[in-house]
Amino acid sequence: MIDEASPMMELKGNKSKVYWDKIDKLASVISQIGEEKTKTSPAIIGVSEIENVSVLEDLVKSVHIKKKNYGIIHYESPDKRVIDVALLYQKRYFKPIFHQSFNPNIYRNNRKVYTRDQLLVSGYLDDELIHLIVNHWPSRSGGEMKSRPLREKAAYQNTKIIEQVREKDPNAKIIVMGDFNDDPINASFKKVLKAKGKKKFIMILLLKANEFIPLINY
């Protein structure tokens, strides 16, 4: 299913063929991530740039990952580009018990910025309670400096979600994931989220993330 606002509507030719080819390639990549060491695909996957839940339903039904029995948690957001975030999870590994969508209250020049929701999902991963926040913060369109306050406000929304979780469990295990359109050295992380970590550890994470770039750069 392709929304009327989708960039795919601008394509000439067989849109359906392009769509199903992309679904097949995405599912193929997902099936390969970590498979060499774990013999399975990821237990949880945060996704962004999702047009509607039908896209996710088509994805998890792909022959590459159908047997993994992925569940879907998705909310429609008010984003002006009609794209959302969502969570995919293997039902045998992760058991969700709560989920909620939050829209950042972001304004620029006294006008509301319609951006993606932030998705909170709580559940048990191998019998251990964890909390996931899936993000897709405002882009750097118009320049990094000009758009920086938007991402800082998105980060602030993350802090409110984290506070909500920690009110019930001060020692809660929280994973913040997604497309932040920012780097660990930016103020959204260092000043707003107050993220801390050893530089060597951060570099290892970045290097490991880069290993997957050839897989998805098709």
Set out the residue ranges of the language-model regions.
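Metal-dependent phosphoesterases centered on the DNase I-like endonuclease/exonuclease/phosphatase
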Residues: L150-Y218
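Active-site metal-binding loops of divalent metal-dependent hydrolases
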Residues: M1, I50, W137, D179-F180
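N-terminal, active-site-proximal structural segment of metallo-dependent hydrolase catalytic domains
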Residues: M1-I65, N69, I73-D79, I83-V85, ...
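A Trp-anchored, charged/polar loop motif used as the substrate-binding/catalytic surface
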Residues: D24-I30, K112-S122, Y156-E163
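Loop/turn elements at helix/coil->beta-strand transitions in domains of secreted/extracellular proteins
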Residues: T40-I44, K67-Y70, D126-I130, D169-I174, ...
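Active-site His/acidic residue clusters
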Residues: A5-S6, E128, L132-S147
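Structured beta-strand-rich core segments of catalytic domains in phosphoester-bond hydrolases
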Residues: I50-L129, W137
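Sec-exported extracytoplasmic/periplasmic mature domains
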Residues: S31-E35, V55-I65, Y93, K160-P170, ...
